[in-house]
Curated annotation (Swiss-Prot):
InterPro entries: Ribosomal_Su5_D2-typ_SF (IPR020568), Ribosomal_uS9 (IPR000754), Ribosomal_uS9_bac/plastid (IPR023035), Ribosomal_uS9_CS (IPR020574), Ribsml_uS5_D2-typ_fold_subgr (IPR014721). GO terms for cellular component: cytoplasm; small ribosomal subunit. The lineage of its organism: Bacteria, Pseudomonadati, Spirochaetota, Spirochaetia, Spirochaetales. The gene is rpsI. One of its GO terms (biological process) is translation. This is Small ribosomal subunit protein uS9. Belongs to the universal ribosomal protein uS9 family. It comes from Treponema pallidum (strain Nichols). Coiled coil: none annotated. Keywords: Ribonucleoprotein, Ribosomal protein. Pfam families: Ribosomal_S9.
Length: 129
């Protein structure tokens, strides 16, 4: 079957490659059902959000290959990739996805640990004497 839209989504260190095809609403992540891959309801809602925002939850089958990061980051990357693929498939989806903030890459990353400190911001305990 022909791919209608292909999109790449990113969140933190997770990267998701997404293909959408005409179908009946099946979402597959790394060859597993989305419900089996993401354990929490919040992660499932996040992944399906672009489909609900464009009222396409029963119109397309979504195939996602995601790697890197943790499950929350991967869920965000999937949502970003699905949103981009939906725009490629049908440009009329762009307005509703942009309004929901689903096409914007979340640029927040983990701040690096600095030398001479315990963490990114936390310092070692200070002793006056």
């Amino acid at each position: 079957m022909k791919n209608l839209g292909i999109g790449t989504g990113r969140r933190k260190t997770a990267v998701a490659r997404v293909c959408i095809r005409m179908g009946n609403g099946n979402v597959t992540v790394n060859r597993r059902d989305v419900g089996a891959y993401f354990p929490t309801a919040e992660q499932l809602r996040r992944v399906r959000e672009p489909l609900f925002a464009t009222a396409n939850e029963r119109r397309y089958d979504v195939i996602v290959n995601v790697y890197g990061g943790g499950l929350d980051g991967q869920a965000g990357a999937c949502a970003h990739g699905i949103a981009r693929a939906l725009v490629r498939a049908d440009a009329s989806n762009q307005a509703s996805l942009r309004a929901g903030g689903l096409l914007t890459r979340d640029s927040r990353m983990v701040e690096r640990k600095k030398y001479g400190q315990r963490g990114a911001r936390r310092r070692f305990q200070f002793s006056k004497r």
